[in-house]
Amino acid sequence: MSPELEQFLNANASAIFGLLGALGGGVLSFVAALLLKRSEFSLQLRSKIVDRQIAAHERILKLAQEMRVMVSSGMLGADGEVARGPRILLSKDEFESWFTRFTEQQLEGSTWLTTATKREVAFVQDYLVTLHMHLADVPSEKCFDLAQLIRQDFIDLSNSLEKVAFAFFETGIHRARPDSLLDWHKYKRPVTEQRLTSTALLQNIAEFKGTLSKVPK
């Protein structure tokens, strides 16, 4: 180091260190502000994700609750009790309207549903599609007769759908991260077929249609 430079440094050491301190403090402040900004953005993003997940699962819970709303026909059933069935099967028009709304509602937020919820929703939809197909052969005035036979199906489907959707609020809500879209959204085919086969709908529909065919027109 040259004598001139050494002399300059000695004479201005305080100023130089003060300048370096100011620069260092400025850099640290900038870095801290940047990290804080990133943290705030991350929190805002997580909040938006959670809000959409909550809304999607709340829609499924509402649909599940609607499925188990029962109404009475005012007549006594074979067991001597007042016959009851799902309100959404009071008539074909009632079912068509609700089925359309079910499809629209579950699609609206399907991206934000947990994989488990998607699979149960898909199974319920398979059941409803099967029911819709069979209703084509059932007069609207006989729709509620079928509803009474498959009442337990709607109770079971409602409970299973509600259970899997509510599980998100118990555990998934704390993750603030949606499940992968690469996960298959349906149960394996043997599982779906076995569950459908065990429903009151598929166990009773042939006999029910047979009874209808014997009714004088």
Where are the predicted features?
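Membrane-embedded hydrophobic alpha-helical segments
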Residues: M1-Q44
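Conserved non-transmembrane functional hotspots
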Residues: V31-K217
